[in-house]
């Protein structure tokens, strides 16, 4: 079973994504800030990580850099309301960029692109 982590300071987005991921067969959890995400990423490995770029206690970019010191293989999907960040996010090595707001269909399509779903 693939493991997924959602990192976003909006609890509603975390709950929605975790619910959808669990329904699709993932073991999924979430963190609401950089501090808790750093602790989680330092002690656990994940196959898929959703990261918001603008978190209450830090930058999603810093978090991505921190993650890459531990894990170079996890797929990272940036979810952000700032469409202008797409190119920068892709340049730092994320797998996909999804603008907010997004739909369940958008998430499902992203998981297909990254080969997490077969159907």
Region locations from a protein language model:
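Acidic, metal-coordinating helix/loop segments flanking the phosphotransfer/catalytic sites
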Residues: 30-48
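Acidic catalytic/metal-coordinating carboxylates
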Residues: 33, 59-62
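Active-site residues of response regulator receiver
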Residues: 52
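Short amphipathic alpha-helix used as the core "switch/output" element in two-component signaling
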Residues: 61-72
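Alpha4 helix (beta4-alpha4-beta5 surface) of REC/receiver domains from two-component response regulators
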Residues: 62, 82-98, 108
């Amino acid at each position: 079973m693939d493991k997924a982590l959602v990192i976003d300071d909006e609890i509603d987005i975390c709950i929605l994504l975790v619910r959808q991921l669990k329904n699709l067969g993932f073991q999924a959890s979430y963190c609401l800030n950089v501090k808790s995400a750093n602790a989680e990423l330092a002690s656990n490995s994940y196959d898929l990580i959703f990261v918001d770029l603008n978190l209450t206690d830090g930058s999603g970019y810093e978090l991505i850099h921190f993650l890459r010191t531990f894990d170079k293989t996890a797929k990272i999907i940036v979810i952000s309301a700032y469409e202008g960040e797409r190119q920068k996010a892709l340049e730092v090595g994320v797998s996909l960029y999804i603008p907010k707001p997004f739909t369940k269909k958008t998430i499902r399509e992203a998981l297909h692109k990254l080969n997490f779903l077969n159907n």
